[in-house]
């Protein structure tokens, strides 16, 4: 079927693509095997190799699973851009859970929606943002609150 925008489409590009069958976690694991000592993250002059990144993600994923996170569970991720955000994101994926990204500028009233709408029970955040998330959780009925923050 010819869509209206296809008449402007470059001839060398296909109209559709088939996404790869590998997950983001698989891509990280493959990179960690191929390039264990290569830099994966560089942040304020500190470097984390692919092997170190994978190990940190595996540890946090195991922690999430020990808290009861199961396949398909939603986990809030409320952080500024930093290596811990990347580690937490991949760890949630490794635990077969779903990442629910949260804008760190949100306040308690807005955060309540992030907790209740996806039915999240676990959140990963930093100390500077934990107060707002805790206030949001505490303002909810007991059955809707976060179990782990």
Segment roles from a protein language model:
Residues 66-67, 94-149:
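Structural core segment of the AMP-binding/adenylate-forming
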Residues 1-21:
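Flexible, non-catalytic linker and terminal segments flanking ANL/adenylate-forming cores
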Residues 7-12, 45, 91-93, 116-121:
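A generic short-segment signal for beta-strand/edge and adjacent turn/coil regions
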Residues 4, 8, 36, 74, ...:
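Residue-level signal for pocket-adjacent positions within structured domains
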Residues 16-21, 29, 37-82, 86-90, ...:
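Conserved AMP-binding/adenylate-forming core of the ANL superfamily
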């Amino acid at each position: 079927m010819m869509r209206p925008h296809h008449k402007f489409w470059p001839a060398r590009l296909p109209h559709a693509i088939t996404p790869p069958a590998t997950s983001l976690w698989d891509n990280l694991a493959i990179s960690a095997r191929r390039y264990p000592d290569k830099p994966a993250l560089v942040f304020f002059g500190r470097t984390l190799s692919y092997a170190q990144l994978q190990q940190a993600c595996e540890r946090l994923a195991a922690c999430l699973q020990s808290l009861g996170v199961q396949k398909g569970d939603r986990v809030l991720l409320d952080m500024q851009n930093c290596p811990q955000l990347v580690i937490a994101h991949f760890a949630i994926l490794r635990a077969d859970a779903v990442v629910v990204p949260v804008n760190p500028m949100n306040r308690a009233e807005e955060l309540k929606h992030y907790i209740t709408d996806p039915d999240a029970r676990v959140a990963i955040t930093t100390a500077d943002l934990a107060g707002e998330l805790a206030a949001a959780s505490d303002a909810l009925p007991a059955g809707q609150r976060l179990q782990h923050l």
